Amino acid sequence: MTMTLHTKASGVTLLHQIQGTELETLSRPQLKIPLERSLSDMYVESNKTGVFNYPEGATYDFGTTAPVYGSTTLSYAPTSESFGSSSLAGFHSLNNVPPSPVVFLQTAPQLSPFIHHHSQQVPYYLENEQGSFGMREAAPPAFYRPSSDNRRHSIRERMSSTNEKGSLSMESTKETRYCAVCNDYASGYHYGVWSCEGCKAFFKRSIQGHNDYMCPATNQCTIDKNRRKSCQACRLRKCYEVGMMKGGIRKDRRGGEMMKQKRQREEQDSRNGEASSTELRAPTLWTSPLVVKHNKKNSPALSLTAEQMVSALLEAEPPIVYSEYDPNRPFNEASMMTLLTNLADRELVHMINWAKRVPGFVDLTLHDQVHLLECAWLEILMIGLVWRSMEHPGKLLFAPNLLLDRNQGKCVEGMVEIFDMLLATAARFRMMNLQGEEFVCLKSIILLNSGVYTFLSSTLKSLEERDYIHRVLDKITDTLIHLMAKSGLSLQQQHRRLAQLLLILSHIRHMSNKGMEHLYNMKCKNVVPLYDLLLEMLDAHRLHAPAARSAAPMEEENRNQLTTAPASSHSLQSFYINSKEEESMQNTI
């Protein structure tokens, strides 16, 4: 086997031929690669001299000629050998070179431009535009794994050497967000979520107008970038599901008008503080409504979460009351009315304790608390009766030991009609599968909403109290919606169920009016003597009723007689006073 030896002169000649061949290949039109972006200080042109620093601290002058390898006909390393097996193994196998020609730049001067240590090579891609060459750093190949320290150092250098435009583009790339509704590019934070312009405008039109969208399919249409206009109903449903809401804004984005309102509120609070300090020195006849509003604003009831509201209402539920029913005694009109009125009178005592534990109720004045109870007591008793009777179709569970059906109610004149309405309401609750949490919310709504529009006075204080009641009602309504959403109902089902429950409250109000009229007729006929607290409640309801203001003179005479009667120890006002005295004594002890 013979081996051909080349002299030094022939080796230099071979080097020049290789360089000429490679440069000729790069000058062909089909190998021109357009620049991806403008050259910066990091990109070196062929007619310029640049110095690059590497982690090792060595420098390399690019003014010298760099060896270029781009021909696919040459191979300087056997592909079967692993990396690092020879001094030439640091190069790519040129049979598998990337589309752009590669320049290997040595980080320190070597004896020969062909021989480099593999840890000293950094690949760069050549870029050609109008005959001037530039270069950009290429991603390291799979087998090029610098140490972690060098990699972090190199990243810091590249970040510090990038221009301002590059850094801004990287920042905008990191801030790219997508629409929560259709997954398109988000244009900003609209109505509480990141959304695109199309979904923002669609939601704005939907909440401003009266658009009753109907899904032609099953209310489960796919809403994405391409199909968001196919179904308006499902698109609006998804807007609500992802959290879009009217008035939803980012906390860090407040317009000038909102900041102005905030400053006005702060100035108003400061004036309220001055007014309260002045009030101690010189008390006036009228209480400042601003001071009262500031106190109501800090009420604990308005800061409760939905779960806390439900827990408070469940804990406030009154205990079970048993009747004095004697199975051996047959029913007649007098015995049944005596049994029911006695049971109602004892339930009223527990109702007062329950109302005082409803969040926000004790923040009202004593007059307003009594007024609401006088307007709602029979509605509250009836909804409790209907709730207990849900599991007993065709019967009414007045107490655990008193279960009556429709036929038993016939012994009292006019009772069958009320029985039928109560049984129908219980069947409706049973069909809707009313939950205990929903029941306590409905009962609280009845208490707070019963007399909110019947305040006789129109002073600033009463108007402020009415506004506070509305805010507590909104809080309980939000709790109802939270319970429905928690049960897994869709948005449309939540709206439908909420409307159905609130419509039942109007039916309960109608039953209460019928029951109040029947009870008043029984009192006028002297069929049964009414107990003190129940009698006071009945008379108070008659006084607050609109029809009572234009009643006949005979009814006026009856009311005058009732008004001049001595106050009972079981009266509502005295019960409140006695309970407050007991609480103060317990606190003192």
From Swiss-Prot:
Residue stretches making up the NR LBD domain: 305-541
Biased composition (Polar residues): 560-569
Pfam families: ESR1_C, Hormone_recep, Oest_recep, zf-C4
Ranges annotated as NR C4-type zinc finger: 179-199, 215-239
Region feature (Hinge): 245-304
Annotated Gene Ontology cellular component terms: chromatin; cytoplasm; nucleus
Record note on domains: Composed of three domains: a modulating N-terminal domain, a DNA-binding domain and a C-terminal ligand-binding domain. The modulating domain, also known as A/B or AF-1 domain has a ligand-independent transactivation function. The C-terminus contains a ligand-dependent transactivation domain, also known as E/F or AF-2 domain which overlaps with the ligand binding domain. AF-1 and AF-2 activate transcription independently and synergistically and act in a promoter- and cell-specific manner.
Function: The steroid hormones and their receptors are involved in the regulation of eukaryotic gene expression and affect cellular proliferation and differentiation in target tissues.
Designated name of the protein: Estrogen receptor
Naturally occurring in which organism (per UniProt): Gallus gallus (Chicken)
